[in-house]
């Protein structure tokens, strides 16, 4: 964990969050500024800055986050209707927190526009 990382502080419980899932490898909570009716952030507990830093995570840790996404989608009622799972990587993608995280978004019809 990083002492200066917002998500590390949330995982440690120093900053409150609306937790929806937690296991040994990942932590998930509702986004404070949701872009869709269902918007959950899925964060590995081990601090890595982003997708370009995956060597800092084990395959099991990364797989746990992806398995969590499917479980959370079902729990949130969007597993069947559909959801989007994405990760912003770097400044041009608007990565705002330098801790790898996945946005699980759903709860409405989305467009195919990604950029």
Which ranges hold each PLM region?
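HIT superfamily nucleotide-processing domains
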Residues: 1-115
